[in-house]
Amino acid sequence: MTTSSYFLLVALGLLLYLCQSSFGTEHTCEPGASPHPQGKCGPELAEFHETMCEVEESLQGGTDDARKKRGRASLLRKRRGFLSMLKARAKRNEASPLPRAGRGIVCECCKNSCTYEEITEYCPPVTEGSG
């Protein structure tokens, strides 16, 4: 084996190790797992998610324009409807005999304690008209 091939093999091994260690921190949930003591569940999770999305939106350049605030109320109603739809889907998935992927907002923030970055992954993308 030549020196460059050996170096490439070592570099590839280090890269794989780094990828594995960074992806190893994902939350996973077993069916029937109990909530984390610092986790947020149910209406508390929905309210926390909504608040964190508003914070993220303002950090990304949201404004306090009154016209946009009126539009925000309907966006919040849509978010609440979306969360209700997700809850209904989660209940259907719990009844399913097939195992589901153990990652989602409930897994990350109720069954585990989530970070700001983790909960804002579930926020809708910020567009120019949503600030």
Curated annotation (Swiss-Prot):
KW Disulfide bond (keyword) present: yes
Keyword set includes Secreted: yes
Disulfide cross-links: C29-C107, C41-C110, C53-C123, C109-C114
Top-rank taxon, per record: Eukaryota
One Pfam family cited in the UniProt record for this chain: Insulin
InterPro entries given in the database record: Insulin-like, Insulin-like_sf, Insulin-rel_pep, Insulin_CS
Propeptide: 59-92
Tissue expression pattern: Expressed by the venom gland.
Keywords on record: Amidation, Carbohydrate metabolism, Cleavage on pair of basic residues, Disulfide bond, Gamma-carboxyglutamic acid, Glucose metabolism, Hormone, Secreted, Signal, Toxin
An individual GO BP term: glucose metabolic process
PTM annotation (4-carboxyglutamate): residues: E118
Signal peptide: 1-24
Localization annotation: Secreted
GO cellular component terms, A-Z: extracellular region
Family indicated by similarity: Belongs to the insulin family.
Known function: This venom insulin facilitates prey capture by rapidly inducing hypoglycemic shock. Intraperitoneal injection of this peptide into zebrafish lowers blood glucose with the same potency than human insulin. In vivo, when applied to water, this peptide reduces overall locomotor activity of zebrafish larvae, observed as a significant decrease in the percentage of time spent swimming and movement frequency.
Protein name according to UniProt: Con-Ins Q1b
Species of origin: Conus quercinus
